[in-house]
């Protein structure tokens, strides 16, 4: 899988993780660090499916809060761990759940770009210019749908329709990716490298956001089964 495709997968999946760290807006965060989490559907599913992981993350956040860490510092510490968990779930989720998961990622990205190109870039590439918390910027109804998609994906990955990735699926995904990448390389020219080197996107924030959305828009235009295969392959090689 092309490195650019892997990076494109990382940035759009990573942004979804922040929904699990929504405690930042709750007045009880200092006295009861996990109180706000109890109302978060995705957090409840994690607790049900992997209680040891749930406790480890919860304990880590309590310690960081006591140390006076900022909201963004806690997000930056916890996000990679939850991302890894979600990537594993995507491998076993049915096609429709995988595609919906990515579709809502793209809807979030488009909504963030309507706020500003800079916010969109920070949303996708927090390591480059510093992140932005979408819970503070985007419409609540969109975030609710984002979180519901997370829940449905995680539950489906452990349900009776649990998916098994085959070598044929991976081979088909690689074949589907090639013309998409060629098309984008021709369209964007040298700027196509922004997918691989996002730090070069400073000053080209709009173009960087457009490129990520163009990439995944092309993937989502594929038939559902094949789009899901590309998504699974991209995140599996992160």
Residue ranges and their predicted role:
Residues 61-64, 90, 105, 128, ...:
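Generic structural signal for hydrophobic core residues of well-folded globular domains
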Residues 86-87, 91-117, 139-143, 185, ...:
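Residues that cap or delimit alpha-helices
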Residues 191-238:
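A cross-kingdom marker for long, charged
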Residues 37, 47, 54, 58-65, ...:
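Residue-level detector of alpha-helical secondary structure
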Residues 114-199:
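Extended amphipathic alpha-helical interaction segments
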Residues 21-22, 26-128:
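N-terminal Sec/ER secretory leader and immediately downstream segment
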Residues 7-22:
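Hydrophobic membrane-insertion alpha-helices, especially the h-region
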Residues 1-5:
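Short, low-complexity patches enriched in S/T/P/G
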């Amino acid at each position: 899988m092309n490195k650019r495709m892997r990076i494109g997968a990382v940035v759009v999946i990573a942004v979804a993780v922040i929904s699990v760290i929504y405690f930042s807006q709750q007045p009880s965060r200092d006295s009861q660090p996990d109180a706000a989490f109890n109302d978060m559907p995705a957090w409840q599913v994690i607790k049900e499916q992997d209680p040891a992981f749930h406790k480890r993350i919860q304990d880590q956040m309590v310690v960081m809060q006591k140390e006076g860490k900022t909201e963004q510092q806690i997000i930056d510490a916890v996000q990679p761990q939850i991302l890894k968990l979600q990537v594993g779930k995507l491998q076993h989720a049915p096609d429709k759940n995988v595609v919906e998961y990515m579709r809502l990622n793209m809807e979030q990205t488009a909504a963030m770009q309507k706020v500003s190109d800079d916010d969109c870039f920070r949303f996708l590439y927090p390591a480059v210019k510093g992140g932005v918390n979408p819970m503070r910027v985007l419409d609540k109804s969109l975030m609710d749908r984002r979180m519901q998609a997370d829940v449905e994906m995680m539950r489906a990955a452990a349900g009776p329709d649990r998916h098994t990735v085959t070598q044929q699926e991976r081979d088909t995904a690689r074949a589907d990716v090639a013309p998409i990448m060629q098309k984008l390389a021709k369209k964007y020219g040298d700027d196509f490298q922004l997918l691989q080197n996002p730090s070069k996107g400073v000053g080209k924030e709009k173009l960087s956001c457009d490129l990520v959305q163009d990439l995944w828009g092309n993937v989502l235009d594929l038939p559902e089964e094949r789009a899901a295969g590309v998504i699974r392959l991209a995140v599996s090689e992160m």
